[in-house]
């Protein structure tokens, strides 16, 4: 297809003449058949809802087709409307658009649906089993047409994948406002999601899937590397060993998942210098990560894998080994063998336990997919039984000294609900969340989080230049940084200097870098200067994961190290999106769910297109200050020591910033007051 044909296809939106039906492509990884949850009346409503995108004369053709999709897949994806052109992020100039901001958003959307990047591209699922960009292909086509025709005096409003329309606004307003899964809190159960999604009225956007900010497994690999490295350091310190990279050699890290997010684990293990063994039940997902170079070896026989693990640990190899099979089989075999596991975690998609996020032991991948749709209650019982075995094997290894941490995927939450042995005597989880032990106190509380950028030229040389700019900025900041954050600065400088060697790019020319407010702002301003001077060939999109300092309220993950009782509140995430929207964000998003699951999390994010202009300089300075320090202020009010120090530093740097700081009360005074009775 020529670029001119591509542009015409975008501008056509939903075509007047329906394209021919598409064959179901079995070479692509597809979403599992969803639960048959709708009543007959609701199925009629779902069909009626789907047909409202099309003129009446097409209904007789589409109605039986959509009814068949609903019956066979549990959803109406409108496969017929899937475009013929290849799906990938193109250079910004190839998109038909009246403003650069809209063209950049189009590239970001297409990257989320790129088959190299997306988990279930034909079902518009980017990662996590149900992290959707859109609910159907009509929504995609209509959204792309709106973006192609909008001006800087309009804002596109997106309701859970549905483009509500273009509304008059102004140049400084966001070009797109996204919400995903914003249901009334009392209607936020797993079954509610299944029902609303099948009706076509809501979707689970995960984090960066529904907000057009996913950059492949690289998007989480820096955070995963930080976590694995610091978990290894904790283990070495506990053993009285110097926590050096050299001493990490031969340590064994075991986990599960080679999907869109979890696929970062083997690469993070190699970068950290440890031996990593990652289980993945889906053969297509395991092969995809192997073919992309994100895992070194692929094994499907535990009798062969176990001696390979022994050799890798003995020889202190920095190597990643994938086990294509059920993770419970792996854990139980490791527990039965005399193998020392140093670090353990889990990244199965347990936010979505009943619809493809977790596969029970004792059943093949295909058997499980059939059971979850045909016998959902039996499938639930099998998952619960599997989780009990899963946790028991982990417990045996933890008793031998393994450091296990929950990676915020609802593993401990769902295991506890299944009756697994994961609770301590006080009723709290036996194992920490990685945010409680590592990410929260060491990074989020000090303002460090997953800043990212995407070069809209899609030119690797532009990405290389941004790496160089970012490294130079961080070195300058490091020279004046206080002692308490120099360790983080050193790790981040090492990361960005090694980024190109680690072959992280899958899809668009993007980079992830943990940075604080000062680092993000100064890096972004230098990027904008480079665009202005012509050293960068095209605009750059700035963004971040929602899994950040301010972006997410999640009591079992991002805010699990908040101990003042406010971990279950969501003011921070909601306020963050509102504040970003009027400080210069090009688009903002607010989601229910993400990470731990639907009904368990509120999170949000932004995207900002910088083009070398003075307006972009202003937006960078105003918006990034708020986007980071909102969360630091909240964390400092929760009496988190590092956050109090960080917000004090920011107030010294920014005279207009005035934050309410906590006063500490003496514990003995509190106890005495409560003991006194009138």
Enumerate the predicted regions with their spans:
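Long, compositionally biased, glycine/small-hydrophobic-enriched stretches that function as flexible linkers
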Residues: 1-196, 202-210, 376-526, 530-543, ...
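Solvent-exposed alpha-helices and their adjacent loops that cap or buttress functional pockets
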Residues: 150-151, 167-171, 176, 186-187, ...
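Active-site-proximal segments of catalytic enzyme domains
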Residues: 196-201, 224-238, 555-556
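Catalytic or ion-translocation cores adjacent to nucleophile or general acid/base/metal-coordination motifs
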Residues: 205-226, 233, 242-244, 249-252, ...
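Residue-level detector of anion-binding/catalytic polar loops
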Residues: 275, 340, 403
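Glycine-rich beta-alpha junction loops
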Residues: 283, 325-328, 347-352, 408-414, ...
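Active-site/ligand-binding-proximal alpha/beta "capping" segment
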Residues: 320-348, 355
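Small-residue-enriched alpha-helical segments and adjacent helix-cap loops
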Residues: 540, 544-575
């Amino acid at each position: 297809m020529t670029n001119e044909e591509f542009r015409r296809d975008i501008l056509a939106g939903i075509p007047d003449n329906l394209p021919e039906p598409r064959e179901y492509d079995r070479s692509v990884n597809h979403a599992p058949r969803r639960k048959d949850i709708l009543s007959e009346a609701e199925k009629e409503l779902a069909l009626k809802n789907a047909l409202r995108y099309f003129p009446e004369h097409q209904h007789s053709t589409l109605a039986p087709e959509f009814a068949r999709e609903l019956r066979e897949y549990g959803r109406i994806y409108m496969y017929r409307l899937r475009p013929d052109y290849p799906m990938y992020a193109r250079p910004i100039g190839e998109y038909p658009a009246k403003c650069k901001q809209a063209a950049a958003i189009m590239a970001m959307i297409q990257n989320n649906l790129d088959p190299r990047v997306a988990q279930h591209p034909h079902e518009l699922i980017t990662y996590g089993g149900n992290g959707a960009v859109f609910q159907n292909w009509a929504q995609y086509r209509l959204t792309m047409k709106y973006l192609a025709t909008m001006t800087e005096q309009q804002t596109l409003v997106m309701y859970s994948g549905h483009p509500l329309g273009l509304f008059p606004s102004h140049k400084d307003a966001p070009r797109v406002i996204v919400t995903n899964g914003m249901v009334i809190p009392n209607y936020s159960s797993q079954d509610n999601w299944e029902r609303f999604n099948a009706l076509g009225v809501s979707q689970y956007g995960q984090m960066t899937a529904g907000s057009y900010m996913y950059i492949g497994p690289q998007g989480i690999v820096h955070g995963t590397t930080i976590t694995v490295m610091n978990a290894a350091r904790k283990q070495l310190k506990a053993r009285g060993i110097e926590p050096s990279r050299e001493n990490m050699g031969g340590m064994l890290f075991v986990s599960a998942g080679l999907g869109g997010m979890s696929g970062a684990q083997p690469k993070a293990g190699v970068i950290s210098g440890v031996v990593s063994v990652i289980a993945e039940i889906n053969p297509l997902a395991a092969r995809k990560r192997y073919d992309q170079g994100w895992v070194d070896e692929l094994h499907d026989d535990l009798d062969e894998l176990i001696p390979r693990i022994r050799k890798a640990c003995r020889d202190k190899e920095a190597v990643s080994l994938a086990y294509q099979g059920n993770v419970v089989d792996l854990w139980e075999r490791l527990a039965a063998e005399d193998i020392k596991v140093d670090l353990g975690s889990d990244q199965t998609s347990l936010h979505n336990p009943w619809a493809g996020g977790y596969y029970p032991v004792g059943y093949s991948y295909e058997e499980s997919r059939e059971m979850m749709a045909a016998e959902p209650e039996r499938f639930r019982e099998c998952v619960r039984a599997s989780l009990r075995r899963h946790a028991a094997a982990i417990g045996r290894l933890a008793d031998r000294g393994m450091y296990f941490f929950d990676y915020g995927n609802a593993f401990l939450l769902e295991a506890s609900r299944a009756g697994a042995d994961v609770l301590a005597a006080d009723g709290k989880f036996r194992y920490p969340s990685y945010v409680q032990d590592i990410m929260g106190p060491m990074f989020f509380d000090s303002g460090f989080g997953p800043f990212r950028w995407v070069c809209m030229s899609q030119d690797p040389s532009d990405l290389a230049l941004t790496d160089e700019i970012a490294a130079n900025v961080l070195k300058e900041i490091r020279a004046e940084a206080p002692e308490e954050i120099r360790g983080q600065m050193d790790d981040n400088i090492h990361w960005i200097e090694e980024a190109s060697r680690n072959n992280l790019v899958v899809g668009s020319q993007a980079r992830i870098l943990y940075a604080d407010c000062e680092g993000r702002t100064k890096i972004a301003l230098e990027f904008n200067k480079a665009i202005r001077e012509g050293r960068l060939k095209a605009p750059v999109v700035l963004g971040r994961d929602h899994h950040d300092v301010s972006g997410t309220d999640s009591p079992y993950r991002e805010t699990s190290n908040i101990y003042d009782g406010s971990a279950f509140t969501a003011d921070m995430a909601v306020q963050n999106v509102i504040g970003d929207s009027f400080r210069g964000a090009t688009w903002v998003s607010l989601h229910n769910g993400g990470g731990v699951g639907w009904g368990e999390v509120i999170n949000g994010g932004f995207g900002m297109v910088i083009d070398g202009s003075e307006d972009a300089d202003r937006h960078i300075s105003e918006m990034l200050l708020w986007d980071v320090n909102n969360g630091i202020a909240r964390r400092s009010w929760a009496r988190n020591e590092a956050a109090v120090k960080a917000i004090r530093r920011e107030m010294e740097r920014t005279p207009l910033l005035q934050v309410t700081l906590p006063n500490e009360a003496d514990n003995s005074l509190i106890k005495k007051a409560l003991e006194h009775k009138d």
